[in-house]
Amino acid sequence: MKVQLIASTILEDPSWAGTDYVGDDETVTSADELAEFAGRNCYLSFDRPNPKTRENVDYLNHILDVGHESVLEHSSATFYIEASRSVLTELERHRHLSFSVVSQRYVDPTELGIHVPPAFTELSGSDADKAKEVLLDVQSFAQEAYEYLVHIFSDAGFPRKKAREAARAVLPNMTNSPMVVTGNHRAWRYVIKNRWHEAADAEIRELAGELLRQLREIAPNTYQDIPTEPYSYGG
C-alpha cells in the first residue's frame, strides 16, 4: 500500500481579511488555525476572551467536545493512494470524499499489480505457503483470462476500451487501484473514526492508520482526540 499526502490547505492572508482576529503562534498549522478562525467568526471572539480556550489546542479540543465540527470543513487534504479495489469500494462509501481513480477501461490493470490482504501475513509454515500458492494461481489465471477476453473482443472488432470493459469482469478484488482522494478534515475524521477500528477490514484499517499519521502532521490539534491505537469495543 502507498499513501502520500500531495496537497493541503495553506493560509494566504496574514491579515485575516482585516478582522480583529489575533493569530496564534507560528507553530500552529494552517488547517488548525483556519478552523479556529472560522469558529471564532461565529461568535466574534477574535480577541480570545476565554483563557480556557485561548490556545489553539484548547479551542479545538472544545470544538471537538461540543461537536461543532463544521469549522473543520474549511481545510482539505489530498492523498495519492495505491490500494486494492476492495479498499476503493470501502472508501467510496464515505460520500464526502472526492475521487479520481485509474480507469480499467483505458488502462491495462494487469500491469498495475496486486495488494495481498494483510491476513496472509498472519499465517505461518505450510499454511502460509499454501495460501500464497492459491493467491498467485488466482492472479495468474485472472491475468490470462483477462488477456484472452481482450483478445476475443478485439478480434471481433470491438475498440480497445470496450474490450477491456468486458474483460475486467474477471479481475480480483486485490487488483491495485491507484486513486487521488480529497476530503475536508471533518470528512477525514469520519473516515478514521469508522475505519481505525479493530473490527474494520484489515487493509482499510491499515490505510486509516497511515492517513491519521500524515493528517496529524498538518493538523495535529484537529486530530488530538483520535487514539494512536485502533478503536476497540472495549474502549
From Swiss-Prot:
Residues reported in the UniProt entry to bind dUMP: 90-93, 103-105, 168, 195
Superkingdom of the organism of origin: Viruses
InterPro entries: Thymidylate_synthase_ThyX (IPR003669), Thymidylate_synthase_ThyX_sf (IPR036098)
Cofactor list: FAD
Intervals of motif ThyX motif: 93-103
Keywords: FAD, Flavoprotein, Methyltransferase, NADP, Nucleotide biosynthesis, Transferase
Reactions listed under catalytic activity: dUMP + (6R)-5,10-methylene-5,6,7,8-tetrahydrofolate + NADPH + H(+) = dTMP + (6S)-5,6,7,8-tetrahydrofolate + NADP(+)
One biological process term in Gene Ontology: dTMP biosynthetic process
Pathway assignment: Pyrimidine metabolism; dTTP biosynthesis
Active-site residues, as the UniProt record annotates them: 195
PROSITE patterns in the cross-refs: THYX
Keyword match Transferase: yes
Domain ThyX stretches: 1-229
Details of cofactor binding: Binds 4 FAD per tetramer. Each FAD binding site is formed by three monomers.
Positions annotated to bind FAD: 70, 93-95, 184-186
EC numbers for this chain: 2.1.1.148
One GO molecular-function entry: flavin adenine dinucleotide binding
UniProt keyword annotation of Methyltransferase present: yes
Alphabetical list of NCBIfam families matching this protein: thyX (TIGR02170)
Family that this chain belongs to: Belongs to the thymidylate synthase ThyX family.
Function: Catalyzes the reductive methylation of 2'-deoxyuridine-5'-monophosphate (dUMP) to 2'-deoxythymidine-5'-monophosphate (dTMP) while utilizing 5,10-methylenetetrahydrofolate (mTHF) as the methyl donor, and NADPH and FADH(2) as the reductant.
Known partners and oligomeric status: Homotetramer.
Protein name, per record: Probable flavin-dependent thymidylate synthase
Organism field: Mycobacterium phage D29
Phylogenetic lineage: Viruses, Duplodnaviria, Heunggongvirae, Uroviricota, Caudoviricetes
